[in-house]
Structure formats: structure tokens, C-alpha cells
Amino acid sequence: MLITDTLSPQAFEEALRAKGAFYHIHHPYHIAMHNGEATREQIQGWVANRFYYQTTIPLKDAAIMANCPDAQTRRKWVQRILDHDGSHGEDGGIEAWLRLGEAVGLSRDDLLSERHVLPGVRFAVDAYLNFARRACWQEAACSSLTELFAPQIHQSRLDSWPQHYPWIKEEGYFYFRSRLSQANRDVEHGLALAKTYCDSAEKQNRMLEILQFKLDILWSMLDAMTMAYALQRPPYHTVTDKAAWHTTRLV
């Protein structure tokens, strides 16, 4: 949609929420996982590749804070970093994701080494981080508004995975449970920022485009996993059966 006249805050929120039609919960890869149709390799591949996204989130949030001159906003935003990195002796989301990896049969080194991260996933996640570093802090902050749709996807995993994949250990589900409340809290802050900052049709159109950019990132990650784990066409599959792609953060 193209906004020609500035929307009211409520109408703008409705436009943002309408973007949920493009959330990756509707991607065939995620639908297969939800319906119990994914193989062990596909579940493991998803967990290993999403870990790269998880470890990039605190870097993204630190970049937003570095560009934000408002102390009150920084005090609220820093909680996102603590949620993932942990604080006061408590483990955060990254540690919880490592336990998810172990619960699906991967070692911690499988995830920490990043050797399973597909180039398409790495490029998509790096694009998100680079945007957060270069955009104005308000736009970078509001790119996180895919959180509007996150509680549904976390709940769907909690509802469907235990019955479809009994081989996944129970302790692996802690991350999804913890994010149910954290995501709702983060949404309130992010929405308030978006509705305050986007006070013109131009800004509202741009913010919708930024939210679509973030949705594109999440969808593209699953496209890369589909090629590798569903269609059995990982990078360079026509010339080698080995993982020949780069496996480290180069910048």
C-alpha cells in the first residue's frame, strides 16, 4: 500500500500489523516443521542456521544504541541485549538456543563454529546488521517490529513440535517459552517509537518498506534452507558434495 495522507497512529499500527501476511510463519519450510513433516536434518539445519541470527541480534541492538542519543531509549533498549547475552549470573537467549541445539542432537561446537551457516542465511543476516549500523536509530529500531508476529510463531512451535518430534529433548523449548513474554514487552516499546517517529506519510511509507525488508530477510533465510535441506541443492552441489562455502565472519 502507498500512503498518500498521513495515517492516524491507530491506522498506521493496523498497516504495520497487516504485514504479518508476509511473516515467515507462512513459509513452506516453517509450515512443514509445524505439521511434523520436517526431517531431523531439516530441523537441525534450521536450528544451526538460526543461531547465526540469534548471535547477531545483540550486535544489531548495540548498533542501534550506539546511534541513539536519547538516554531513556537506551535504558529500555539495552534490555534486549541482556535478554540474549544474559545478566546477573543468569543465562540469556543465546545460551538457551545452544541448549536447543543440544536438544535436537547438535553439539555446542556445531553452532558456535558457524560451519553449518549457509551463505544465503549469512548474507541475509549481515544485511540486517549493516542496516542497523547505517540507518538512523529510529528506523533501525523499528525494523525489529517483526516482533509483532513473533509470539504466534513461538507458540506454534511449543504447540506442535513436542507431539511431532518426540526425539527433541524438553529442555530445548525454554527459548520459545521465554520469548513469549519478552517479545510482547519489546513490541510495546517498538510500536510506541514507530507511531511517534512516523508523523508523516513519507515516514510511514518508508517504515512499511523497512518492515518489508526485515520480512524479506526472514523469508530469504528459509529459502536458503529449503534449497539445502529440502531440495538437496546446497551451494556448489553441482561440483562437490562437500560444504565449500565460507564459514567465518569476515568483517
UniProtKB/Swiss-Prot annotation:
The keyword Oxidoreductase applies. Keywords: Oxidoreductase, PQQ biosynthesis. Its EC number is 1.3.3.11. It is an enzyme of class 1 (oxidoreductase). It comes from the Bacteria. GO terms for biological process: pyrroloquinoline quinone biosynthetic process; sulfur compound metabolic process. InterPro entries: Haem_Oase-like_multi-hlx, PqqC, PqqC-like, Thiaminase-2/PQQC. The keyword Nucleus does not apply. Pathway: Cofactor biosynthesis; pyrroloquinoline quinone biosynthesis. It catalyses: 6-(2-amino-2-carboxyethyl)-7,8-dioxo-1,2,3,4,7,8-hexahydroquinoline-2,4-dicarboxylate + 3 O2 = pyrroloquinoline quinone + 2 H2O2 + 2 H2O + H(+). One of its GO terms (molecular function) is pyrroloquinoline-quinone synthase activity. Belongs to the PqqC family. Ring cyclization and eight-electron oxidation of 3a-(2-amino-2-carboxyethyl)-4,5-dioxo-4,5,6,7,8,9-hexahydroquinoline-7,9-dicarboxylic-acid to PQQ. NCBIfam families: PQQ_syn_pqqC. This is Pyrroloquinoline-quinone synthase. It comes from Klebsiella pneumoniae (strain 342). The lineage of its organism: Bacteria, Pseudomonadati, Pseudomonadota, Gammaproteobacteria, Enterobacterales.
